[in-house]
Amino acid sequence: MRPVCLIAACLSAASGQTPAIPTAPITTFGVTVVDSVGLRGDIYLLRPNTDALPKFQKLKPVGAVYTSSLNIPPRSFLEGFPGVTDRYEWFAIDYHGTFWIDEPGKYRFLLASDDGSRLYIDDKVVINNDGIHAVQTETGTANLKTGSHRIRVSYFQGPRAGVALVLGVARPGEERWRIFNTKEFLPPHKPEN
């Protein structure tokens, strides 16, 4: 069963059900202003005709962007990354950060992208959506314990045309998808004495 992601919803081709992704502000790939509670995305330039995620450890980033969520529905992309590079095709972004789980259990994740992407939680692949393709959605699950967890979303864009990168989550017991936002997964605040 492979769900197909549309801008605000994900249609399950097999069941006909529509688990809606709540409307959230559409974001860019990020900004150059450091966000200490968000994701840092290192930007890499790729060779034309790259057809899969690169081995990032063999590349040197040209800059970084920061964001607390990945909500870039399918759209055209010609603006590049102001302040970093004007590249709008043949690039990759390797996002990484941490998030906090208060409620342990089975979390469902949704990753929609055009072109390839991969989601890692605590260095384990949860979703593999790699390759050159139009917008495509994959889902996966992770059993998470209370505490801090590492998250990584690797993404690449091949030839110019459209882009998309949406990361959704459903907490244990939730039916509806929501956009994953690091600001909703912060550690508890400890008051100072």
Task: Describe the role of every protein-language-model region.
Residues 3, 16-17:
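Short low-polarity hydrophobic stretches
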Residues 17-108, 112-193:
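Extracellular/secretory pathway-exposed regions associated with glycan biology
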Residues 8-16:
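Hydrophobic h-region of N-terminal signal peptides that target proteins for export
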Residues 1-7:
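Sec-dependent signal peptide recognition
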